Amino acid sequence: MSLPQIVTPEYTLQLNSIKEPVRYRPYLVREEKIFLTAKESGDPKDIESSIRQVLKNCTFGEIDIDALPSFDMEYLFLQLRGKSVNNIVTVKYQCQNKVRTEDERTDENDTGRCGALNPISVPLDEIKVVVPDEHTNIIPINDDITIEFQYPTIAVMQQVLTGKKDTVAFTTEVLSRCIKSIVEKDGTVHEARDSTPEELREFIDTLSIQQIERVQAFFNTMPTVTYDTTFACSECGYTEPLRFEGLQDFFD
């Protein structure tokens, strides 16, 4: 006699980079084992790979996880975590209110701040992907040339981090991998897929410092997973607006 089958609930969500709703299910014991194995190794690459594998499993193989922009992957992971474990995550935040003057400080290490650790409850289903108003992926670098960028994926970032230790080389590699096309004033379009990685890196290396700063504006204003709340310190009563931004902010 066969054992009964447990019905797993299904949900849908909308990602910025995909027009159709994405189906997903909570992760199960077999996926939890993947996380635990990666956690035991302590290797960030293993942890990242485990997240990607679990997301692939829980979206029924219907979307290309490796092609998702990093912010969409983070949002999907947070929503999946909310349905699988608990919709509420508790994050500790240290109060930054200055409660002691310079004369009142006890020693040179005393910052004068309250410093009390406060638990903050974050409902994962209230997290949003925020796109800054000024954000654009079309960057004119001069009067004659415009670059169209595509968002970095987690897979790309992992490959770059694995191979590059030098900051300048890292920047060049990331920028070159995120170019989608280069457009000239006369309308000529050079698709990045038609160029070699070496050609794209050489193109980045010919940019001036001012042009690189324009390009970096694309990355500095990229969409992020965000949660806004009001912080109230249980120790000193200080209040301030507080924003959690990026995957790391949602976990201690």
Indicate where each model-derived feature is located.
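Long C-terminal interaction/binding lobes of large macromolecular proteins
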Residues: 1-252
